[in-house]
A protein has these predicted regions:
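Generic N-terminal amphipathic, Lys/Arg-enriched alpha-helix
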Residues: 1-8
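Glycine-rich phosphate/pyrophosphate-binding loop regions near the starts of catalytic domains
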Residues: 6, 14-149
Length: 149
């Protein structure tokens, strides 16, 4: 790792992995962290061909857990809603998220809702956290081999 944090450490790539593996995980020394993922979703537009922010949030967190060798089981689903968002849009996004959770076999068990002033939220932000049971320990980028796909 470099001696200073740069934007590269937030990209989700090798530097993010190094940051997590070299600083964060050793500090907590808790195996359960290997099957816990948290993410925030801030996309525009909220609805797009093939999906929406709700489906993206659920599928993104489920994928993050699966990529760590875990079977996703439970999610939190928190909303930051901008004042003025049409309720029909919110209903479609939440219904889509529920359908994605059902399709993935996960339960949404908790969440939070906040409303921010008009002009301060880009419509809707979603934060999720997921917990899964580790089925394939040691599934890491370092363990990948040619032909694993």
């Amino acid at each position: 790792m470099d001696g200073i944090i740069t934007l590269d450490y937030g990209s989700g790539g090798r530097k993010t992995s190094a940051l997590i593996e070299e600083i964060i995980v050793p500090a907590f020394k808790n195996e359960a962290l290997s099957a816990f993922s948290s993410d925030s979703f801030v996309v525009t537009p909220l609805e797009f061909p093939g999906g929406d922010i709700g489906k993206l949030a659920v599928c993104g967190t489920v994928n993050d857990l699966a990529m760590c060798g875990a079977k996703p089981e439970y999610l939190s689903f928190s909303l930051i809603i901008e004042e003025g968002l049409p309720t029909d849009t919110l209903r479609r996004v939440v219904t889509s998220a529920a359908a994605a959770a059902k399709a993935a076999g996960v339960q949404i068990v908790t969440g939070d809702t906040k409303v921010v002033e008009r002009g301060r939220g880009d419509g809707l932000y979603i934060n999720t956290a997921g917990i899964g049971r580790i089925k394939y320990p040691g599934l890491t980028p370092a363990a990948m081999r040619a032909g694993d796909a």
